[in-house]
Amino acid sequence: YNRRFFRGRDDVKPAPKVYAIMESNDIEKNHLQFFGTSMPETERTKAEKQIKYLLQTFVDAREYGSILNVDVCDWELLDRFVNDLNDNGQVTFESLGSEETHEKLQGLIKIAKVMSKKYDAVVINPPYMGASGMISTMIEFIKQNYNNGKSDLFSVFMLKVARMLKNNGYASMMTSYTWMYLTSFSKLRGEMLE
């Protein structure tokens, strides 16, 4: 226990990773042609493929929030790709807004990097919402990604936390105790015991 944790030490201060989920819906995909132009073709192709994956993953991301599953990417490569913006000093109709796309991609990469990591400890107070209160796209997303926790949003977060932890990591959650005995949570219990 360290009551001065948030003050840090002389050279080390804690840096919480708190972000608002960003959507990729309004990122102009045609601008990708202006990024990574000085990179070797194989690296550029790999980076573009990973950026397109992130853009697809973050479509309507505000609907799903932190239950999105983000694969680990080559973050250093993506940083180089996004920071290599070349519009030849000319603003054309095609390149108009590429600086804004640059900023959005940087933010998206930052959030994706945090969401893809594994952590030693995860502490949450998940939202509570039964399936009857969810919109159809959320229900479909949960069935595809968290089927054993589809009874309630808090059980989805329980599964998400389990995926976010390193081996032998610690989790702390404020959840309803009903998951321990209701039959609708039996598959969740089975997965949590694995």
State where each predicted segment sits.
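SAM-dependent methyltransferase catalytic region
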Residues: 1-193
